[in-house]
Every structure is written in C-alpha cells, then in structure tokens.
Amino acid sequence: CTYCMPKEHFDSNYKFLAKGQIISYEEIILIVKSMLPLGLSKVRITGGEPLLRKDICSLISMIRDLDENLDIAMTTNGVLLKNKVQTLKESGLDRVTVSLDSLDDDLFKEMTDSKFEVSRVLEGIKSAIDAGLKVKINSVIKRNKNENQINNLVKTSIEYNIPVRFIEFMDVGTTNSWKLDSVVTGKEIRDIIQREFGPLTKTKPNYYGEVAKQWKMARHDLDIGFIESISSPFCGSCTRARISSNGKLFTCLFSEQGYDLLSIIRMQADEHDLSVLISDIWNKRIDRYSEDRKEVKVISKPVEMSYIGG
C-alpha cells in the first residue's frame, strides 16, 4: 500500500534482502520455542504480504506443533487468500485479519497501488469465514482520502458478521509522507459511524494488552475496534514483540533499530540462550514513543512498517 511500501521508494531498483539474510522457518521456530516459557500466547504472521512467502503453511504447521494452545493469526491483503485458505486452516491457523481500506475499486487501487479489484479481497474474506477461521477487517483511515468509506466498511462487517477495526494513520518509518493533519482520530471515526448507525458503547478489553479499544454497536450486535496510537497511545500496556524478516527483535513499532537475534542463532545459540536474552531485552525496554511523541526528538531512521508488520 502507498502508506506502507510506496512505489517511489520500493521500486525495481530497491535492494531487497538476499536469501541468506532472511530468517529461515527453523530459525523462527527456535525463537518461538524460546519465548514460550516467557508467556508467549499468540503468534501473528505479517509482512509485507505473508502469502507470498514460499510454503508459508509449513511454517504455520511447525508453530502449531510447538503448542496446540497457541493462538496463530495472520494479517494479509487478502488477494491470495481464497486459493490458500483451506490449507491455512488445515495447517493450524486460527484467525486472519484482512487489510481493506476502501470498497470503491478506484480508490482501492489507488491506495493499494495495485490492479486488483475489491471483489477479490471480499471473496477471500468469505472463503476464510466458510473455512471456519475467525476473521477481522483492518482499515487505515486517512484524512481527505477514505473517510467516505468508513460507513461502507461498517456495512460490510455487518453483512459478513465480522468485526472491523479502524486504525489511525501512523508515523511508522520515513517513506509514507505522514503528517498529523492526515490523521482521522478514533473519536472522529466513531462520530461518523454513530450518525449513520446509532450509538456505540465502549466495552471492556478482551485481554490485557489488547491494542484495539472495543465498542459495541447495539443495533447490530457488532464489535468495532479502534487502534488509536496517535490520539490515545497504549505504550504502558503493550505486550507485543516483533521479529523482522532478517531476524531482528523489535520491542516497539516505532523503533530505530532492533536486536539481532539471527546472528546469535547462527553462532549456535540454543533455545535457553535466546530465552534469557529475550527476557533481558524485554524487561529493560523503555519504548514509549507514542506517549512521548510530542517531546521526542526526530528518530534518525525509524524502521519501516513493511519490515516488521503491524
């Protein structure tokens, strides 16, 4: 998408990672195993676009074999979902979140910088529901871009009987031309929804550290989430660690640099070594960028969203 991997920066001349620099499935599994004793309960596979990774279902199966109680999720643009959803389900995937910012084909193509039509994503969503996966829609809202899609996205979530989560446009990385003026706050989005669909009632989080603030639309018994890292940050309750495709551990979405686990693994570190290291890193983290945004000096080179997922 234009706010994640804009073509002017990630074009045919961009130097992507060489194969040897990419973390292998076996190395991912070692990291997951090392985090289980630390309280890991959920693994989300993101991107980039995870369904472009060769044999991604094998990774899901390997993670599932570690612990049958792990919650395994995936975030995808949905374009390839329809043809892979049955194998994903059989491999052990529990839930899928589909990114969808517009139901208007022209605007969808503009925001995703693609030639695909919305219908293909909707087919993927329906296929995932039919396969028995738990499904959510994620929608990033930008001012003067897709505010007019908010109520259409709510209507779609009603039609499919699945939650939709609205995300404030975030200042992740340096390539997405972020400006505070482009942010439509969660409150503004709720006001738009309530004018069309009636009152929303705030509900309790489903678990500690849930990033989306949950609201209930009584008229349709529908859950709507709002991820408000700009207007209402949640650093103090964040429980998410991120592993990049080159094996770095990031303790914050807005980090300038990560901790290189891959090099340590390739120096023969074992599961225990990693567990001790990750525990130490996590317990010493001081990331509060979203809460301190106004006071923080400019980060010289924050990590791009496409490196570590959402």
Explain the meaning of each model-derived region:
Residues 7, 141-143, 170-172:
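Short "lid" loop at the C-terminus of a central beta-strand within the Rossmann-like core
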Residues 1-23:
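Canonical Radical SAM [4Fe-4S] cluster-binding loop centered on the CxxxCxxC motif
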Residues 49:
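Conserved G/P- and acidic residue-centered "switch" motifs that form tight phosphate/ATP-binding loops
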Residues 4, 111-114, 264:
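Residue-level signal for well-ordered alpha-helical positions
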Residues 11-16, 104-112, 173-177, 260-261:
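A short acidic, helix-capping loop that chelates divalent metal ions and anchors anionic groups
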Residues 155-159, 169-310:
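Auxiliary Fe-S-binding modules of radical SAM enzymes
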Residues 22-45, 53-167:
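Radical SAM/AdoMet-radical enzyme domain recognition
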Residues 5-8, 100-102, 168, 253:
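Short, small-residue-rich loop/turn micro-motifs
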